[in-house]
Amino acid sequence: TVYAPWKDGYINDKKGHPDPNNNSIVGKLVFGKFSELFTGDASRDEENRLIKEENTKLSSRVLKVGHHGSGSSSQTDFLRSVRPEIGVISEALHNDYGHPNPQTMKRLAAEHITVYQTATQGRITIHTDGKTWNVTTEK
């Protein structure tokens, strides 16, 4: 299921310009009892709109943490709507942006979400038969 971008147009930044990050493709993969929510570079504004318009549909076992774990993504209300068991952060080691943001990591920990990071664990693979699932990492 694709939840965003929105049919009625872009979410704009504070200057009224379309914000590419807040217009990321957001989709949910469901296979049997397994589900994963992919959030692209979605930030706070897009997360808030998802909560408002799709709240009951967001719950997923796995969350691809938005915007590489930036401070503008994975707000507490959004995490509580998704209720993931694990979060996957795709980021480079020692990247120029400081991803993942320490506050984002604290929010994930506060919600008891197990975090996997490509920077430290390499390729992250999730295997499922639709009933059970497990995670393997390269490192």
Regions found by a protein language model. Give the residues of each.
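Core dinuclear metal-dependent hydrolase active-site scaffold
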Residues: 1-62, 120-139
